Amino acid sequence: MTPGEAPDLLTGLPDVPVRWSAMVRDAATGAVLADHLGSRVLRTASVGKLFLLLEVARRIVAGDLDPHEQLSWTPEEWVADSGLWHRLDARRLGVADLALLIGAVSDNLATNVLVRRVGLDAVQAMARSVGCRDSTLLDRVRTDRGPEHPPTLSLGSAVELSDVLAGLHRRSVVSAEVSALVLGWLSADTDLSMVAAGLGLDPLAHDEADRGVRLVNKTGTISVVRVDVGVIEGPGRALAYAVLAEWEPGQDPRDDVLDAMRSVGRRLRSAAGA
């Protein structure tokens, strides 16, 4: 499939009242197959946690961070919403378990503890080192975000995020070992509500091929944002995608947004040969 043969992969993404940034790449080569305002920078909610996972994986592989090191949260770091740790009795968990919680349920509390452990500056340096100029994690997760804090958790563009996902598929982001670690964490993602909804997979168990399809993805959700980035690997080919949607406060086009994202997922499944 060439770019000229894939004009319809990202149809149905109207810009009113939603701002989109979307791109599909051949995961094996990185070639752009479809582009809908892919350079537009939008809020990406929890997708910026991807760069935290990359930095944690880099340190584990380099021997600079023990995956079994036990970490606990402080009252200042405590936050609820996405995740499970804030519901668990365990006050201490290992580094690798925290990374898995982020990959599986986008755990906010695990995010804050790992950001403290490796440093936000290092996470942002990781984003730059993998070629991202606009996509990064801006802050830790906060229950209340004031004027003294970054205005949002993360920003990104489809052109950069799809490139990172394609690189992960090729095991070329930082190193093959780092890429494999991050892919393993992301393969546990339970949020298949967006693009991945078009694949018909079991949201709780899809690390093995189902109907010839394998998926790794990371999503982000806040009241005005839905984002899904990932790799769909089918019998015919592997496709890296990033679909970002943002709208103004007071609007609620989420049903239309989710319908459009699900339709993209169905087209990607077909394009992957499944």
Label each residue range with its predicted role.
Residues 62-88:
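Short, glycine/proline-biased beta-turn/loop segments that scaffold the active-site neighborhood
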Residues 1-14, 33, 171-195, 209-214, ...:
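Structured C-terminal helix/loop/strand segments within mature extracytoplasmic catalytic/sensor domains
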Residues 30, 43-71, 241:
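Active-site SXXK
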Residues 78-112:
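Conserved catalytic neighborhood of penicillin-recognizing serine enzymes
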Residues 16-20, 115-170:
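Mid-domain, small-residue-enriched loop/turn segments at the edges of structured enzyme/sensor domains
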Residues 35-43, 84, 88, 147-151:
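A short glycine/serine-rich beta->alpha loop
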Residues 1-43:
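Beta-lactamase-like hydrolase cores
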Residues 54-62, 116, 163-170, 269-270:
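Short glycine/serine- and small hydrophobic-enriched flexible loop segments
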